[in-house]
UniProtKB/Swiss-Prot annotation:
CC terms in the record's Gene Ontology section: membrane; plasma membrane
Subcellular location: Cell membrane
Glycosylation site residues: 5
Record's bilayer topology term: Multi-pass membrane protein
Extracellular side: 1-25, 76-99, 161-197, 259-271
Keywords: Cell membrane, Disulfide bond, G-protein coupled receptor, Glycoprotein, Membrane, Olfaction, Receptor, Sensory transduction, Transducer, Transmembrane, Transmembrane helix
Example of a GO MF term: olfactory receptor activity
The name this protein goes by in its record: Olfactory receptor 10Z1
InterPro entries: GPCR_Rhodpsn, GPCR_Rhodpsn_7TM, Olfact_rcpt
Amino acid sequence: MGQTNVTSWRDFVFLGFSSSGELQLLLFALFLSLYLVTLTSNVFIIIAIRLDSHLHTPMYLFLSFLSFSETCYTLGIIPRMLSGLAGGDQAISYVGCAAQMFFSASWACTNCFLLAAMGFDRYVAICAPLHYASHMNPTLCAQLVITSFLTGYLFGLGMTLVIFHLSFCSSHEIQHFFCDTPPVLSLACGDTGPSELRIFILSLLVLLVSFFFITISYAYILAAILRIPSAEGQKKAFSTCASHLTVVIIHYGCASFVYLRPKASYSLERDQLIAMTYTVVTPLLNPIVYSLRNRAIQTALRNAFRGRLLGKG
């Protein structure tokens, strides 16, 4: 008998953490700690920027939306993963898997476009500082944020439709800890070559288009920095971009490795490690690398806590 389509009545089952009970408990404690730090750090960044009028600038506007996007991304994946590590149900319904893939892909794509918008903001700040206020006006900033979110959701929807348009075979065990495109695609019946190509093209478009704008922005930024006569001035100008560059390199490096490879090169252990970095570690780097080293953010956080404590008193 041939393989049968069972997606209408059977759930998917995650096998990403089919290890010993002691190791699962250790992983649960580790990922719960990382998740709580990630969640609270990003929420604090959003609150600090919202409460401090000195941070109502385009750069911090984009940063707050990036923190919001990262928070939503982790909310769609990590709580479900922690439940599995704690001994909860490892099954997820067909609709639940599709929803998880849609939201995780949408937020991941949105992050790419927000990072591109942040790169453009740095370009205007360094290359045209006298016209920064007029160029980066509220209307343009709102358009960049809305476009990032809408485009991210369109690409996320496209990837989800490509995957769940396929028929799935009797094997319904996902060798992963969430419904990501490569492991779910590996469960499909028949020739998945065309679908694999479509996913590759969609991923390539997201990464290339956003990374192209970042590269162009930094090419102009580098040229402007090299024209600064003093080494101190060059160092100060570059320091405003260093955190953004760090996040870009890690974000795009992990995403390219996961999504821009053919199905034949999929490796369970290696891809789970990269996915862990992309899902758990990268969202934590945003507040640490990009924000918590920023004196303005630190001051805003202190003022917010001080105001709250005084209000209680």
